[in-house]
């Protein structure tokens, strides 16, 4: 399948939200019950690091960064979110998206990317490891999903090799 990776646009939101919701519904991707509105999502995510993989007009997946803090000393640290449409998983799209997000983050001056991934989401953990992230810890029983099940979260990190720290 041919696809391109480019900046997310406002008119991508309906498809992005549907992909996000599909991930939420797995019970292994997020501690929330529904995708937020565009306005809420737009305020939370870094405007300069939002990508989609698309084939024609179809969004196949998305990746974006959330700043971890508004403190200037942490301005180069962000959390990764990456979600793929169920029908497009296992095709290398996630690897391409995450690698492109890493490059874009370095262009924008981020020196550390981190991800918090539910222990059960082994595919996402492997994706991050493939893209150079390392496990740095575990937060046990961090939160519960809508089914009232507690989940451990694996902390993963990637330090930039190009952004001076």
Language-model segments: what does each one mean?
Residues 89, 115-125:
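Conserved beta-strand-loop-alpha-helix junction that forms the acyl-donor binding cleft
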Residues 105-117:
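Conserved GNAT acetyl-CoA-binding A-motif
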Residues 29-87, 98-99, 104, 159-161:
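Acetyl-CoA-dependent GNAT
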Residues 10, 17-35:
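Helix-loop element at the rim of GNAT/NAT acetyltransferase active sites that forms part
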Residues 90-103, 126-130:
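Conserved acetyl-CoA-binding loop-helix of GNAT-fold acetyltransferases
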Residues 64-67, 114-118, 129, 134-151:
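Conserved catalytic-core motifs of GNAT/GCN5-like acyltransferases
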Residues 58-61, 123, 150:
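Glycine-rich acetyl-CoA-binding "A-motif" of GNAT/NAT acetyltransferases
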Residues 2-16:
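A short beta-loop-alpha structural element at the N-terminal edge
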